[in-house]
Amino acid sequence: MSARRTPLLLRSLFVIGAVIGVVASVEAAPPSSPVPVVDHHQHLLSPQGAALLNTPELAENVPPAVTALLRAHEAGWNDATKLEPLYASDAVVLDVGGPAWLQGRTAAAEHFAKRFVRPYTILPLAWQGDERSGHLAALYSRGEGDARRNVGSVAMRLVREDGAWRVAMVYPVFPGPVLEQPLDAERLVALLDAAGIRRAVVLSVGYWFQSPHFKVDDPVRRTREENRWTAEQVARHPDRLVAFCSLNPISDDALMLLEECAKDGGFKGLKLHFGNADIDLTKPEHLRRVRDVFAAANKARLAIVVHARGGDDYGARHARQLVDELLPDAPDVTVQMAHLWGGAAFAPEALAVYAEAIAAKHPATRNFIFDISDAASAAGTPEAAALLVQRMRLIGIERLYYGSDAAFSGHPDPAASWQALRKGLPLTDEEFARIAGNVAPYLRE
């Protein structure tokens, strides 16, 4: 599960996109289709994790004069005479109650003077512009801290007119993005029950708190607390859930945190997320630190789940380094590749390296397995799905394990995820049945 720089911005854009797009429904799998025994890729969401996702990372590059314009708009929230000078002469505003485009500064001012019954704050999430014009993505928000609520999302175009910044276009969307709510072990077990799945591997998101994509106080303490919370939640359902701890493997405290996880006794393995840590294996220092973590996990007999995509350029060379330089450091434990090829957008070149290494019986791949969470949706096109299945068969169906990823932040729940795989991948019924029945070695020990 990846949490990146501006989750609220992404959710705001999803809301805006829903106004003008169509979300395709997922057809149900045939009633006779098998049900997975285990979900090998799941997450919980702690209260501190939900707070992290719900805290917007504000744009820091907004020009002071634009910020002043936003503050003036807030101050004039119910007064058209104060709002009118803030708009360009030919301003256009989408009337979400229409929908229709309102034209002119007077119409825009009168519309927004009536739109809000209580004061609001404009929280800028992204800005791009020059000295003459710019575009802003923002939230309409009220309250502070846990009491804050996002009442709407907005896209704006701003221009300089008569020597001052003015609003030229406003595209508001209501309601605003929904704040994430914690997902505890009881809720996850209920989702598993609804899907008919017996067990799940719960991967801590402690690595969020050591990620450069978030700014948190005392990241080591917060990572430790997240790992502990995950273990305590999983311990409530020992017959259903298994916990993996997590950390940033290139942090200075990685080996200390790993040792704590190993001594805890509540963890079966370790989750590493190269993307959240901005890891680039082509950098010698990154490679050295990750190798040390692999070796330490092997010594502690902790299985490893790795989200291997560290950046947009992830491909064959990174996959070769993982096979040739990381897997040999963990020869005695299971290493599970997350999301089949390593996460996010389909990376056929990386997957080809993994498949060919296994087909060639590379000695480091003896305990190398793959979960298929998000595989169908990320593949995208039928052509990509066909190529994906070709690579899956080269890897071997016996090395493929069902996973669904977190049931929050827009991800489907375990049942819907399995249905999406059944619909999106051109595997045979026999192959789906084999995947559904596969149970990772670390759960059989």
Task: Identify what each model region corresponds to.
Residues 268-269, 282-401:
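Catalytic pocket-lining loop regions of alpha/beta-barrel enzymes
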Residues 69, 79-96, 435-438:
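Short, well-ordered alpha-helical segments enriched in acidic and aromatic residues
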Residues 151-174:
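Short beta-strand edge/turn micro-motifs at domain boundaries
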Residues 48, 92-102, 115:
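A short gly/proline-enriched turn/hairpin at secondary-structure junctions
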Residues 29-36, 54-76, 81-85, 168:
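Short, low-complexity N-terminal intrinsically disordered segments enriched in polar/charged residues
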Residues 92-93, 106-151:
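Surface-exposed, charged secondary-structure patches
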Residues 36, 52-54, 81-85, 164, ...:
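Mid-to-C-terminal alpha-helical segments outside catalytic/metal-binding sites
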Residues 198-199, 207-312, 317, 374:
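Active-site gating/metal-coordination segments in enzymes
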